[in-house]
């Protein structure tokens, strides 16, 4: 009898141990990411050909304690390597594990390589050559807790590579993972009609058809690790292969199970058909191009086993939440009598099904941890009797308080916005504390920004609430889910709001009181236009006629545009960012503004103020709350530094000039007493700069009008 280890992804151990036991293996023992077992050579061949779950089978050649580099070398040297492979065969060592004396896997592999080469030489045999790529004989070594295990890769390339896959879709499912889904769902034990409405390249259905037709999964593989092993018995192996071929031929003819697969992507369906044909099971599977939400049950009962899209796979969050909710609704209403088994890495998506799982298991799709949930749908089950809206979401089910509030807000603000002449505005700002988000409407898009939740609220709770918000929004305000953009906002730290989020751009042109501005909805946390400063910008425009205007910390120059459109004699726009200066120029061009009277300066604003000798009639400044940019000479804190900043700015202000100063620090306290002593008049103008869509959040910013005393 020989000792083996069958490796598999984490979460497969139980299923794999059961499979090995059914094959007839003895001394079956589960371990981490695999199972140890004992078998004869003939049984080992059969397991290698027939296992649907293992990734690799290795033959254990040596196992013993190892506490030094010398012991590692001796352990490898004591193996009779010339009896295992020819010196004409290339070899390689795959070494795993560190600890104690061994802190480098390359060192471990090198010691074993040296021992193998020395063993050949000491037996007066010319040494074999090492090949790092595609070696003919592969040594598999594992070091853990002071024990070294040296083995031979018996099976060869990963066993999930059956040989039928031509190319993969964008998010391929490994074959042995698909097989484990079939095993753990209960389908393999009691095969019946099988449906996969997100079939992709067909892996789940093909693996199921191979099971039902009694086809060995390794039958189409062209290489096995034991082929260059000197103890390989070709006759025994060939007998096992021929038996498998005969069973496959008979199995396809006898198979009466029906398989149905569909996908919305016609290219993937074509690929699935090619893969099924390569696997020899195309005649057993009916494939078609279809939206999963339009399918109907092909039988009164059966299994629906699938790997639908999720965050790490395909699609965006808002659309996926809607999809999962609608799937759950469809399953409950139309698939009574069926079992549903789904693999997904996103708990929020799974919870959006609104179904109660019979079983929940953990599986790994590569390195990605996933939940595999099994649901029994009873024939008389329905979600509820209230009508479902056309897009599949019943507002009464999902976050009713939030849905009702934002629906009311949207209706009220839409009329107001039209009258104001704006098309970008805020429709919800954490009105209900449990739903701690801001929702901004930009033309026919919305951006949802999640505020950082208090540490006292469990993460699972905040995630569920956010999922409910994203589910409720489309029906509540009548928006397509693919026009919903999700962002996460934390309390501002330095220049965090200016950091790039996404290389892709979604650019729009918005209108505000006759001015046009370019928006980038996806590139940064902010879009290029601070909506809460809308009235402040208009005020700047109203005060600009015939005046020399300066805009500091200008961002994308929107206040400068209003000043220019308001008839300013000149406009100087200063910002430290080249990106935003270029953006400001684009905004000027959008509004047909050009000429030498419009100056754009890329500079550290604080240094620019110190160096400036010009006089201005109107200055607008909206500095960051805090900044420690590497491009600034010193850090800036608006509370700490505002007196020095304003006293410096007043020196640039003409005798009858005005300074509009704004910031977003929530607990900002203006040092009026000190400024008054410096002959500076300060007046708070929050009441005229807070837009209607921000009335629910009066502390969003504070604005001051400053003049000479």
UniProtKB/Swiss-Prot annotation:
Primary localisation category: cytoplasm
Keyword entries, A-Z: Cytoplasm, Methyltransferase, RNA-binding, rRNA processing, S-adenosyl-L-methionine, Transferase
Subcellular location: Cytoplasm
One GO term describing the cellular component: cytoplasm
PANTHER family: RIBOSOMAL RNA LARGE SUBUNIT METHYLTRANSFERASE K/L, RIBOSOMAL RNA LARGE SUBUNIT METHYLTRANSFERASE K_L
NCBIfam families found in the cross-reference section: PRK11783.1
Protein name: Ribosomal RNA large subunit methyltransferase K/L
